[in-house]
Amino acid sequence: GTLAEPEKLPYVGSAKAVQVLDLDGDKRDDLLLVNWDNANPFRFRLQNAAGQFEPEVHLTLPPIRSYWADDLDGDHRTEVITIAAKSGRAALSQFTRKPAETLVGGLKNGQFSILPLQRTDKARRGLLWTDLDGDGLQDLLVADPDGGQLFVHFQQKDGSLAAPKTFPTFTGVTDLAAADWNGDGKTEVFLLSSDEKQVGVTSLDANGRLPFPQLVPLNARPLAMTVGALKAGAASLVTLIEREDKKPGKDGKEETTTVRELVVRGADGKASVQKLADSFKGNPSSVSIHDANQDGLADVVVLTPYEKIKVLVQRKEEKDGALFEEVDVNPPGGTSDQPWLALADVDGDGKQELLLAQKNFLRAVVLTSDGGEKATWSFTVREQINGASSSSRIVAAATLAQPGSKSPLLFLLDADRKALTVSERDANGVWKVAKTVELPVTDFTGLAPIGLGTKEANTIAFLGGNSVAWKRFSGEQWEFTELDGYETPIKDGFLRDVTSGDLDGDGRKDLVFLETVRAYVDLVVFEPPHQLTPGNRWPVFEERTFRQRRNEASEPREAVVADVTGDGKNDLVLLVHDRVLLYPQEK
């Protein structure tokens, strides 16, 4: 027989070891990934009934010196023995589920799950949660900018994601947007490719496929795009483009200049084009539709690194052929190398404010004008929402509705503190930190409210370059539960490593600890349900025998339990310096 092509499983960060084990006792093999150098050394991916590995679950525990994972009692569920890095204390633990504790209000501190993505070196990739198939549940769309593919994870009724389906698309897709563009009740997906300098649109066909995108005619290089309602009842594709234009020069010869324009296109093919200021030179990172001045008309907000925020304020009627007034406004706290925005109704007036970050806090702002003939525009601060501390660095924000309150809960991603901060508005109308939840990973650039298992938003999604994640606020949470502990009675002993095996033929596996200060083997008996009982111990060698070799590796350095004599009984084999020591099991 031959082996099929390997199925590649990406993972978050780095991993020093991987084991195939049944971690939850369902008789299906799961994956345990270990990185001793990480503050959260253990993470796992459970295998579901469909044979698919679920997202990564990271667990917090003190630093470890070594570990051993095995099914000690034959119940098809893995026990884990760890040796603490500093104290040298051994612990017997299991992966267990527990009901989530209350976080704030009616929300629970549910599970944080991370879905690794196929890695890319591109600075940006398209990521989007949207209801693609019309079942009322949001699906996850992930662009592979290097391979010219689009991965679609359809959401199941229980809130889990199915294995991704792959569809061909442009290479270098940096932006994804979705809306019912043509009013047919189906979701259209828009893709912007920086490599191919194109914008395309596609939607699910009758066979459940996403055909290759049809090009949107632009005749220019697209810089950024979004889709949404600029006018009530219709979605528009909004694109910033850059093209070359020729005009007479000073000496009468033609000169080539770069022109930037805003293009608003409907599904009927009609498009309006508005030239932008010649001073607009930077590379925009995003374009959004938002009523920035709260006049009831949707505006276009453009973010560009190191530049002012450009707002294209929609007029009630065109003026000199232009529907938008182009204004550049200084953000509170100055420009940023990685600008971002969020939207929230922070004062309970039913209108969303623009949330802009300045290191450790957010400011909710509204665009205002002095009303003059040549109006001066600026941002008026309505609220300030502080992070958990002065050392916070807020890199993303999102909201969830809070039952019984006009004001939502505001979630802040704190990159420097590696935490998710939950803020709420108190009875006096002041925003305060209600809770801070530590996160194992914070390599994300965006947050979004999504619904898992429901049409209503009940979860916060995290968006990153090589992974996505989500934090639930209900259900159960995984934890690493200690069942028993053990400290060696060897004086000044230093437990270096551990393995397991049945050394007395009772059907249960014993623990073999390697102690490396006095060169002992320390046997510990595992007794049901989960008790560690001291057993036999002995020195492997006299210290003076290897005195000249004390600068070498700690000894004994490896052990294995196996039947090497062929009598059907397990033996103990040690590796010590340049020797292999065999301890046969006696009859």
Predicted regions and their residues:
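Beta-propeller-forming repeat regions
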Residues: 1-587
